[in-house]
Amino acid sequence: VLGNTFHLWLRPGLDVIARHGGLHRFMNWSGPILTDSGGFQVWSLGDLRKISEEGVVFQSPVNGDRLFLSPEESMRIQRVLNSDIAMVFDECTPYPATRNEAALSMELSLRWARRSRVAFDAEDLGGGVVDALRESPSDAAADAANQAAGRPSNGLFGIVQGGVFEDLRERSLECLLEIGFEGYALGGLSVGEPKEEMLRILSHMGTRLPTNRPRYVMGVGTPEDLVEAVSQGIDMFDCVMPTRNARNGWLFTRHGDLKIRNARFKDDLLPIDPECTCPACSPESHGDDRAPFTRAYLHHLQRTNEMLGASLATLHNLHFYMQMMREMREAILRGRFEAWRRDFSGARGQGIE
Protein backbone atom coordinates (compact mmCIF):
# COMPACT_ATOMS: atom_id res chain seq x y z
CA VAL A 1 0.00 0.00 0.00
CA LEU A 2 1.02 3.63 -0.39
CA GLY A 3 1.38 5.94 2.58
CA ASN A 4 1.01 9.67 2.00
CA THR A 5 4.03 11.24 3.71
CA PHE A 6 2.67 14.78 3.60
CA HIS A 7 -0.69 13.99 5.19
CA LEU A 8 0.74 11.54 7.73
CA TRP A 9 3.27 14.18 8.79
CA LEU A 10 0.42 16.61 9.48
CA ARG A 11 -2.07 14.08 10.88
CA PRO A 12 -1.76 12.05 13.05
CA GLY A 13 1.83 13.36 13.26
CA LEU A 14 5.15 11.58 13.56
CA ASP A 15 5.12 11.11 17.35
CA VAL A 16 2.23 8.66 17.43
CA ILE A 17 3.55 6.71 14.42
CA ALA A 18 7.04 6.58 15.96
CA ARG A 19 5.60 5.12 19.17
CA HIS A 20 4.21 2.28 17.05
CA GLY A 21 7.59 1.70 15.43
CA GLY A 22 6.38 2.85 12.02
CA LEU A 23 3.44 2.49 9.68
CA HIS A 24 3.37 -1.31 9.62
CA ARG A 25 2.38 -1.60 13.27
CA PHE A 26 0.38 1.63 13.24
CA MET A 27 -1.97 0.29 10.57
CA ASN A 28 -1.47 -3.41 11.38
CA TRP A 29 -0.25 -4.15 7.85
CA SER A 30 2.40 -6.82 7.30
CA GLY A 31 2.73 -6.28 3.54
CA PRO A 32 5.00 -3.84 1.70
CA ILE A 33 4.50 -0.10 2.17
CA LEU A 34 5.68 2.64 -0.20
CA THR A 35 5.71 6.25 0.96
CA ASP A 36 5.76 9.20 -1.40
CA SER A 37 8.05 12.12 -0.60
CA GLY A 38 5.36 14.75 -0.10
CA GLY A 39 6.48 16.59 -3.22
CA PHE A 40 3.26 16.07 -5.17
CA GLN A 41 1.06 17.29 -2.32
CA VAL A 42 3.23 20.38 -1.85
CA TRP A 43 3.03 21.01 -5.61
CA SER A 44 -0.77 20.77 -5.45
CA LEU A 45 -0.95 23.54 -2.82
CA GLY A 46 -0.38 26.14 -5.54
CA ASP A 47 -0.21 29.65 -4.09
CA LEU A 48 0.18 28.29 -0.55
CA ARG A 49 3.80 27.28 -1.24
CA LYS A 50 7.11 28.90 -2.18
CA ILE A 51 9.89 26.86 -3.80
CA SER A 52 13.60 27.59 -3.38
CA GLU A 53 16.84 25.65 -3.82
CA GLU A 54 16.67 24.57 -0.18
CA GLY A 55 13.14 23.21 -0.31
CA VAL A 56 9.54 24.36 -0.04
CA VAL A 57 7.94 26.71 2.47
CA PHE A 58 4.18 26.33 2.63
CA GLN A 59 1.14 26.95 4.74
CA SER A 60 -0.36 23.92 6.43
CA PRO A 61 -3.81 23.16 5.02
CA VAL A 62 -4.73 21.80 8.47
CA ASN A 63 -4.05 24.74 10.79
CA GLY A 64 -2.29 27.40 8.72
CA ASP A 65 1.14 26.89 10.31
CA ARG A 66 4.21 27.82 8.27
CA LEU A 67 6.10 24.62 7.44
CA PHE A 68 9.27 23.71 5.56
CA LEU A 69 9.94 20.52 3.60
CA SER A 70 13.29 19.69 2.03
CA PRO A 71 14.92 16.52 0.67
CA GLU A 72 16.57 15.94 4.04
CA GLU A 73 13.37 16.50 6.00
CA SER A 74 11.41 14.24 3.66
CA MET A 75 13.95 11.45 4.19
CA ARG A 76 13.78 11.96 7.97
CA ILE A 77 9.99 11.74 7.93
CA GLN A 78 10.03 8.64 5.76
CA ARG A 79 12.53 7.05 8.14
CA VAL A 80 10.08 7.54 11.00
CA LEU A 81 7.31 6.08 8.84
CA ASN A 82 9.67 3.11 8.26
CA SER A 83 8.30 2.25 4.84
CA ASP A 84 9.83 -0.44 2.65
CA ILE A 85 10.18 1.96 -0.30
CA ALA A 86 10.84 5.68 0.04
CA MET A 87 10.71 8.20 -2.80
CA VAL A 88 13.11 11.06 -3.47
CA PHE A 89 11.85 14.58 -2.85
CA ASP A 90 11.12 16.18 -6.21
CA GLU A 91 9.19 18.96 -7.88
CA CYS A 92 6.30 17.71 -9.97
CA THR A 93 6.61 19.57 -13.27
CA PRO A 94 3.26 21.25 -13.97
CA TYR A 95 1.30 21.08 -17.20
CA PRO A 96 1.39 23.13 -19.27
CA ALA A 97 5.04 24.18 -18.97
CA THR A 98 7.44 25.60 -21.53
CA ARG A 99 10.54 23.62 -22.36
CA ASN A 100 12.64 26.05 -20.33
CA GLU A 101 10.32 25.79 -17.33
CA ALA A 102 10.34 21.99 -17.55
CA ALA A 103 14.15 21.95 -17.82
CA LEU A 104 14.62 24.18 -14.76
CA SER A 105 12.16 22.06 -12.76
CA MET A 106 13.85 18.83 -13.85
CA GLU A 107 17.33 20.10 -12.91
CA LEU A 108 16.06 21.16 -9.48
CA SER A 109 14.56 17.70 -8.99
CA LEU A 110 17.92 16.14 -9.91
CA ARG A 111 19.74 18.24 -7.31
CA TRP A 112 17.11 17.29 -4.77
CA ALA A 113 17.47 13.62 -5.79
CA ARG A 114 21.20 13.73 -4.97
CA ARG A 115 20.46 15.30 -1.60
CA SER A 116 17.75 12.68 -0.98
CA ARG A 117 20.22 9.87 -1.73
CA VAL A 118 22.82 11.29 0.66
CA ALA A 119 20.26 11.91 3.40
CA PHE A 120 18.65 8.50 2.94
CA ASP A 121 21.98 6.70 3.33
CA ALA A 122 23.06 8.92 6.23
CA GLU A 123 19.80 8.18 8.04
CA ASP A 124 20.75 4.50 7.78
CA LEU A 125 17.39 3.66 6.28
CA GLY A 126 18.98 0.98 4.18
CA GLY A 127 22.57 0.50 5.27
CA GLY A 128 23.86 -2.86 4.12
CA VAL A 129 20.55 -3.64 2.47
CA VAL A 130 20.89 -0.70 0.11
CA ASP A 131 24.44 -1.72 -0.78
CA ALA A 132 23.32 -5.28 -1.51
CA LEU A 133 20.49 -4.08 -3.74
CA ARG A 134 22.92 -1.93 -5.71
CA GLU A 135 25.20 -4.90 -6.31
CA SER A 136 22.53 -7.45 -7.13
CA PRO A 137 18.84 -7.34 -8.04
CA SER A 138 18.26 -10.71 -6.38
CA ASP A 139 15.92 -11.01 -3.42
CA ALA A 140 18.30 -13.50 -1.82
CA ALA A 141 21.11 -10.94 -1.59
CA ALA A 142 18.81 -8.34 -0.11
CA ASP A 143 17.36 -10.82 2.37
CA ALA A 144 20.81 -11.96 3.47
CA ALA A 145 21.98 -8.40 4.01
CA ASN A 146 18.77 -7.59 5.80
CA GLN A 147 19.15 -10.52 8.17
CA ALA A 148 22.78 -9.67 8.88
CA ALA A 149 21.92 -6.04 9.60
CA GLY A 150 19.00 -7.00 11.81
CA ARG A 151 16.64 -4.48 10.21
CA PRO A 152 13.98 -4.49 7.49
CA SER A 153 14.81 -3.97 3.83
CA ASN A 154 14.37 -0.38 2.68
CA GLY A 155 15.01 1.17 -0.68
CA LEU A 156 14.95 4.61 -2.25
CA PHE A 157 13.46 5.17 -5.71
CA GLY A 158 14.45 7.97 -8.08
CA ILE A 159 11.79 9.90 -10.00
CA VAL A 160 12.19 10.80 -13.69
CA GLN A 161 10.83 14.27 -14.49
CA GLY A 162 10.97 16.48 -17.58
CA GLY A 163 7.35 17.15 -18.49
CA VAL A 164 6.30 16.17 -22.01
CA PHE A 165 9.81 16.68 -23.46
CA GLU A 166 11.50 13.42 -24.39
CA ASP A 167 15.08 14.73 -24.31
CA LEU A 168 14.57 16.17 -20.82
CA ARG A 169 13.15 12.86 -19.65
CA GLU A 170 16.20 11.07 -21.06
CA ARG A 171 18.60 13.43 -19.28
CA SER A 172 16.70 13.02 -16.03
CA LEU A 173 16.96 9.23 -16.22
CA GLU A 174 20.65 9.35 -17.19
CA CYS A 175 21.51 11.47 -14.16
CA LEU A 176 19.40 9.35 -11.81
CA LEU A 177 21.20 6.23 -13.02
CA GLU A 178 24.52 7.90 -12.21
CA ILE A 179 23.33 8.58 -8.66
CA GLY A 180 22.00 5.03 -8.27
CA PHE A 181 18.65 4.00 -6.83
CA GLU A 182 16.89 0.77 -5.88
CA GLY A 183 14.08 1.51 -8.33
CA TYR A 184 13.01 4.15 -10.85
CA ALA A 185 9.70 5.93 -11.29
CA LEU A 186 8.14 8.06 -14.01
CA GLY A 187 6.63 11.10 -12.29
CA GLY A 188 4.76 14.11 -13.58
CA LEU A 189 2.28 12.10 -15.63
CA SER A 190 -1.51 12.34 -15.44
CA VAL A 191 -1.23 15.93 -14.14
CA GLY A 192 -3.51 17.49 -16.74
CA GLU A 193 -1.73 16.65 -19.99
CA PRO A 194 -3.75 15.08 -22.84
CA LYS A 195 -3.88 11.29 -22.76
CA GLU A 196 -1.90 11.11 -26.02
CA GLU A 197 0.96 13.05 -24.42
CA MET A 198 1.02 10.77 -21.40
CA LEU A 199 1.09 7.66 -23.60
CA ARG A 200 3.82 9.16 -25.79
CA ILE A 201 6.13 9.77 -22.83
CA LEU A 202 5.27 6.38 -21.37
CA SER A 203 6.09 4.67 -24.66
CA HIS A 204 9.34 6.62 -25.03
CA MET A 205 10.60 6.09 -21.49
CA GLY A 206 9.11 2.77 -20.37
CA THR A 207 11.60 0.56 -22.19
CA ARG A 208 14.51 2.88 -21.30
CA LEU A 209 14.15 2.24 -17.57
CA PRO A 210 16.63 -0.36 -16.27
CA THR A 211 15.26 -3.90 -16.40
CA ASN A 212 17.10 -5.03 -13.25
CA ARG A 213 15.22 -2.59 -11.03
CA PRO A 214 11.51 -2.08 -10.29
CA ARG A 215 9.88 0.30 -12.79
CA TYR A 216 7.09 2.45 -11.42
CA VAL A 217 4.60 4.88 -12.98
CA MET A 218 3.18 7.30 -10.44
CA GLY A 219 -0.46 8.40 -10.39
CA VAL A 220 -1.70 6.18 -13.25
CA GLY A 221 -4.44 5.16 -13.95
CA THR A 222 -7.38 3.49 -15.71
CA PRO A 223 -7.37 -0.27 -16.40
CA GLU A 224 -6.45 0.49 -20.01
CA ASP A 225 -3.59 2.75 -18.86
CA LEU A 226 -2.16 -0.05 -16.72
CA VAL A 227 -2.34 -2.58 -19.55
CA GLU A 228 -0.54 -0.15 -21.87
CA ALA A 229 2.10 0.58 -19.24
CA VAL A 230 2.74 -3.12 -18.59
CA SER A 231 3.24 -3.56 -22.33
CA GLN A 232 6.03 -0.96 -22.00
CA GLY A 233 7.72 -2.88 -19.17
CA ILE A 234 6.25 -1.10 -16.14
CA ASP A 235 5.95 -3.13 -12.92
CA MET A 236 4.31 -0.85 -10.35
CA PHE A 237 1.52 1.72 -10.15
CA ASP A 238 -0.34 3.86 -7.67
CA CYS A 239 -3.59 5.67 -8.28
CA VAL A 240 -6.63 6.85 -6.36
CA MET A 241 -8.92 5.79 -9.20
CA PRO A 242 -10.18 2.41 -7.91
CA THR A 243 -11.04 3.82 -4.46
CA ARG A 244 -12.17 7.33 -5.42
CA ASN A 245 -14.33 6.02 -8.24
CA ALA A 246 -15.79 3.43 -5.87
CA ARG A 247 -16.86 6.13 -3.42
CA ASN A 248 -18.66 7.83 -6.30
CA GLY A 249 -20.41 4.68 -7.52
CA TRP A 250 -18.15 4.02 -10.53
CA LEU A 251 -17.38 0.30 -10.67
CA PHE A 252 -14.96 -1.50 -12.97
CA THR A 253 -15.93 -4.84 -14.51
CA ARG A 254 -14.61 -7.21 -17.12
CA HIS A 255 -17.24 -5.98 -19.57
CA GLY A 256 -16.93 -2.25 -19.03
CA ASP A 257 -17.60 0.32 -16.33
CA LEU A 258 -20.79 0.38 -14.30
CA LYS A 259 -22.17 3.60 -12.81
CA ILE A 260 -24.25 2.14 -10.02
CA ARG A 261 -26.06 5.41 -9.21
CA ASN A 262 -27.86 5.28 -12.59
CA ALA A 263 -31.60 4.61 -12.37
CA ARG A 264 -31.32 1.53 -14.62
CA PHE A 265 -29.85 -0.41 -11.67
CA LYS A 266 -32.63 0.44 -9.18
CA ASP A 267 -34.31 -2.98 -9.59
CA ASP A 268 -31.34 -5.00 -10.90
CA LEU A 269 -30.94 -8.29 -9.01
CA LEU A 270 -27.56 -9.21 -10.53
CA PRO A 271 -24.30 -8.79 -8.62
CA ILE A 272 -21.94 -6.06 -9.83
CA ASP A 273 -20.23 -8.62 -12.06
CA PRO A 274 -21.47 -12.24 -12.11
CA GLU A 275 -17.94 -13.40 -13.07
CA CYS A 276 -16.20 -11.57 -10.21
CA THR A 277 -15.03 -13.33 -7.03
CA CYS A 278 -14.72 -10.25 -4.80
CA PRO A 279 -16.46 -10.18 -1.36
CA ALA A 280 -19.32 -8.09 -2.79
CA CYS A 281 -20.00 -10.23 -5.87
CA SER A 282 -19.14 -13.64 -4.44
CA PRO A 283 -19.17 -13.82 -0.61
CA GLU A 284 -18.96 -17.62 -0.79
CA SER A 285 -15.49 -17.30 -2.33
CA HIS A 286 -14.40 -15.79 0.99
CA GLY A 287 -16.01 -18.30 3.35
CA ASP A 288 -19.31 -16.43 3.65
CA ASP A 289 -22.49 -18.33 2.76
CA ARG A 290 -24.53 -15.18 2.05
CA ALA A 291 -25.87 -14.43 -1.41
CA PRO A 292 -24.08 -11.78 -3.50
CA PHE A 293 -24.98 -8.14 -2.93
CA THR A 294 -27.22 -7.02 -5.78
CA ARG A 295 -26.82 -4.00 -8.00
CA ALA A 296 -30.15 -2.75 -6.67
CA TYR A 297 -28.82 -2.82 -3.10
CA LEU A 298 -25.57 -1.11 -4.10
CA HIS A 299 -27.65 1.49 -5.97
CA HIS A 300 -29.70 2.11 -2.82
CA LEU A 301 -26.60 2.41 -0.62
CA GLN A 302 -24.95 4.87 -2.98
CA ARG A 303 -28.11 6.95 -3.37
CA THR A 304 -28.53 7.22 0.41
CA ASN A 305 -24.80 7.82 0.99
CA GLU A 306 -24.48 4.82 3.28
CA MET A 307 -20.87 3.99 4.15
CA LEU A 308 -21.37 0.31 3.30
CA GLY A 309 -21.96 1.23 -0.33
CA ALA A 310 -18.54 2.86 -0.63
CA SER A 311 -16.91 -0.02 1.27
CA LEU A 312 -18.37 -2.75 -0.95
CA ALA A 313 -17.60 -0.78 -4.10
CA THR A 314 -14.00 -0.27 -2.92
CA LEU A 315 -13.56 -3.98 -2.23
CA HIS A 316 -14.86 -4.74 -5.71
CA ASN A 317 -12.69 -2.21 -7.56
CA LEU A 318 -9.52 -3.20 -5.72
CA HIS A 319 -10.25 -6.86 -6.43
CA PHE A 320 -10.74 -6.03 -10.12
CA TYR A 321 -7.39 -4.23 -10.31
CA MET A 322 -5.55 -6.98 -8.42
CA GLN A 323 -7.11 -9.70 -10.58
CA MET A 324 -6.22 -7.77 -13.73
CA MET A 325 -2.59 -7.46 -12.63
CA ARG A 326 -2.50 -11.14 -11.65
CA GLU A 327 -3.76 -12.17 -15.08
CA MET A 328 -1.17 -9.98 -16.79
CA ARG A 329 1.65 -11.56 -14.79
CA GLU A 330 0.42 -15.04 -15.66
CA ALA A 331 0.03 -14.12 -19.35
CA ILE A 332 3.59 -12.75 -19.47
CA LEU A 333 4.97 -15.92 -17.89
CA ARG A 334 3.12 -18.02 -20.47
CA GLY A 335 4.15 -15.83 -23.40
CA ARG A 336 0.52 -14.88 -24.06
CA PHE A 337 0.43 -11.22 -23.06
CA GLU A 338 -0.64 -9.83 -26.45
CA ALA A 339 -3.39 -12.44 -26.79
CA TRP A 340 -4.58 -11.66 -23.26
CA ARG A 341 -4.50 -7.95 -24.06
CA ARG A 342 -6.73 -8.41 -27.13
CA ASP A 343 -9.21 -10.50 -25.16
CA PHE A 344 -9.26 -8.00 -22.29
CA SER A 345 -9.80 -5.04 -24.61
CA GLY A 346 -12.56 -6.84 -26.49
CA ALA A 347 -14.40 -7.80 -23.31
CA ARG A 348 -14.12 -4.29 -21.85
CA GLY A 349 -15.69 -2.90 -25.02
CA GLN A 350 -18.77 -5.13 -24.86
CA GLY A 351 -20.61 -3.08 -22.28
CA ILE A 352 -22.66 -3.98 -19.19
CA GLU A 353 -25.78 -6.11 -19.42
Q: What spans do the regions from the language model cover?
A:
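Glycine-rich phosphate/ribose-binding loops and adjacent secondary-structure elements
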Residues: E107-L110, A119, E123-L133, S138-N146, ...
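C-terminal extensions of enzymes
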Residues: D90-P96, D273-E353
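Glycine- and acidic
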Residues: P94-R99, A103, G183-L189, M307-A310
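Non-catalytic, usually N-terminal nucleic-acid engagement modules in DNA/RNA processing proteins
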Residues: L2-V130, D139-Q147, D257-L258, A263-K266
